[in-house]
Amino acid sequence: MTILDDLQWRGLYADCTDLAALTQRLGQGPVTLYCGFDPTADSLHVGNLVPLLALRRFQLHGHHPIALAGGATGMVGDPSGRSAERNLLTPDQVAHNIASIKQQLGRFLDFDATTNPARMVDNSTWTAPISFLEFLRDVGKHFSVNAMLAKESVRARLESESGISYTEFSYMLLQAHDFLHLRETMNCELQVGATDQWGNITAGTDLIRKKLGAPAWGLTFPLLTKSDGTKYGKSTSGAVYLDPKRTTPYRFYQFFVQAEDADVIKLLKVLTFLSAEEITALDTDLKANPGARAAQKALARAVTTLVHGDTECANAIRASEIMFGGGLDGISESLFQDVVGEIPTKELEAAKLSGAGAPLVELLVHAGLAPSKGQARKDIDGGGIYVNNARVGEASRAVTTGELLFGKYLLLRKGKRTYTVVKIV
């Protein structure tokens, strides 16, 4: 299977400036390609995985990938896919974000490959030395304003209430210049990106044709969306980031394990390196036994391992088991706090657990797991109450400080999934 065959099977092909010519060129040998990542935040997010993993897919097929960190373009802001002007970042913010993003890019590509090592560049290194007048003469001269206004990214903003500034209007010239520079200095013939980058990419192929008379291609992938058409990559608490400080590995894992049945096979194709045979088998299993959620677990395991590594993925799976009655032995306090972060929490004075401890029936009422002590006794007698995920057998049971997790937490559960954390203050 060629790289283009693989992309098409995975649903990663949207458009190409000249598919027949690119197919022929790829058949002649390895090409150098690039994709840009602007430092709009200090971490990449789930949506960035599509182009980033595409670079890796090309590398696995023997091609030469370049990851471009947008130290220059990040100072301007891309209008593509935006309904309003971006807030300009300060040079210090851009520098901080670039440093963080470069570190993340380095985890997904092989920079030590023997025959086709990946490379990383920062467009500020060749953009910063150019004067404004030089840029207007050497780049701006080759662009028709009429053609720029016809680009979807510009036209959509012109039709919006906020309009578009000259700063963002000029963004496509900067990206076009990047492609030209890489074509001249690194023989980069292909730029890849999401469909919202089509206008910027074709600006680059046009500039290369006019300035160099040399071939260059653009290839785009569909935006990562759910079955209902909305963008994929956000949880109820916001964007899902690759940086563990912004989205913990546990929450990252949970985001994917909760994928809808209608989305999971598509996500397996787009966000993992599982083979067609493996994904087809998971699809068959999903249709036969959707309740097992084997496809979702495979997705979460594959993507979490890819982004955070084997150890963090194993920890995330272990933590997930807590919410399904798993034991708490060996769980760290930070992991416990992450898991129970969205569980209702009730505070309790430490004195209540002193001496012989507090009656469990009273704690259940305090925690909101029972309306009365009488109902709490019935629930305990019925085998439906758990303390730290261990079933309680006697309604007369008391809870003491010795049972506190990390000296300050008590995990109470009613039934299979109704939890409350009691925090000692």
Swiss-Prot record:
Keywords associated with the record: Aminoacyl-tRNA synthetase, ATP-binding, Cytoplasm, Ligase, Nucleotide-binding, Protein biosynthesis, RNA-binding
Described purpose of this protein according to its UniProt entry: Catalyzes the attachment of tyrosine to tRNA(Tyr) in a two-step reaction: tyrosine is first activated by ATP to form Tyr-AMP and then transferred to the acceptor end of tRNA(Tyr).
GO biological process: tyrosyl-tRNA aminoacylation
Protein's UniProt name: Tyrosine--tRNA ligase
GO cellular component assignments: cytosol
Location of the motif 'HIGH' region: 39-48
Keyword RNA-binding: yes
Chemical reaction(s) catalysed: tRNA(Tyr) + L-tyrosine + ATP = L-tyrosyl-tRNA(Tyr) + AMP + diphosphate + H(+)
